[in-house]
């Protein structure tokens, strides 16, 4: 049995979960999220009102989907109650970010500014020209947007310039030695 998959998902007060076959709809104070769980995985409520994820057999694919499905549903519950935030920072001379309406505009050493449009459910906040946060209720969207932004200018291993997650340690390389 999957150690993660067999744990029930507690449902906090103020969260309404609707299970309709393979579809899960989670409503909470921050918004609404839905998910379609893979076919063999089954969802149900136990006596305490928590969500229980089960699988029909121990086939390899079903074992893999068991823990994944439980984690995805748990992420929905956390998203509609607390939300997700990713903090990022920019290193490099002249590199900066600024908010233009709901979009984020970057100066990253290219000949043009790079504009990232905020998808539905995602908000950007700029604390300083070199620090900003990405906030939303969908963990996958927040993570994907932050990865896309980091990809605009990956941290350089020689000088450390670029966009990185807050607290991320960049493995530095030693440059060439002179003659």
UniProtKB/Swiss-Prot annotation:
Quote the cellular component terms of the Gene Ontology held in the record. Answer: cytosolic large ribosomal subunit
Query: Some GO term, biological process aspect, for this entry: which one?
Result: cytoplasmic translation
Keyword RNA-binding included in the entry's annotation: yes
Q: Name one GO molecular function term.
A: structural constituent of ribosome
Xref: HAMAP family: Ribosomal_uL6_B
Q: Subunit structure, per the record?
A: Part of the 50S ribosomal subunit.
Protein name stated in the entry: Large ribosomal subunit protein uL6
Q: Which organism is the protein's source?
A: Mycobacterium leprae (strain TN)
């Amino acid at each position: 049995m999957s150690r993660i998959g067999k744990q029930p998902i507690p449902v906090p007060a103020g969260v309404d979960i609707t299970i309709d076959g393979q579809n899960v709809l989670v409503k909470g104070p921050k918004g609404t999220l839905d998910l379609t769980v893979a076919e063999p995985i089954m969802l149900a409520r136990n006596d305490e009102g928590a969500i229980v994820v089960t699988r029909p057999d121990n086939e390899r694919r079903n074992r893999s989907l068991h823990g994944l499905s439980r984690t995805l549903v748990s992420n929905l519950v956390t998203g509609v109650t607390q939300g997700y935030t990713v903090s990022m920072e920019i290193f490099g001379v002249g590199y900066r970010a600024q908010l233009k309406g709901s979009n984020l505009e970057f100066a990253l050493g290219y000949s043009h500014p790079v504009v990232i449009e905020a998808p539905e459910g995602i908000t950007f906040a700029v604390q300083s020209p070199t620090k900003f946060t990405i906030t939303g209720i969908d963990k996958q969207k927040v993570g994907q947007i932050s990865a896309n932004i980091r990809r605009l200018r990956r941290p350089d291993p020689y000088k450390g310039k670029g966009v990185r997650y807050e607290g991320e340690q960049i493995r530095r390389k030693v440059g060439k030695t002179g003659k």
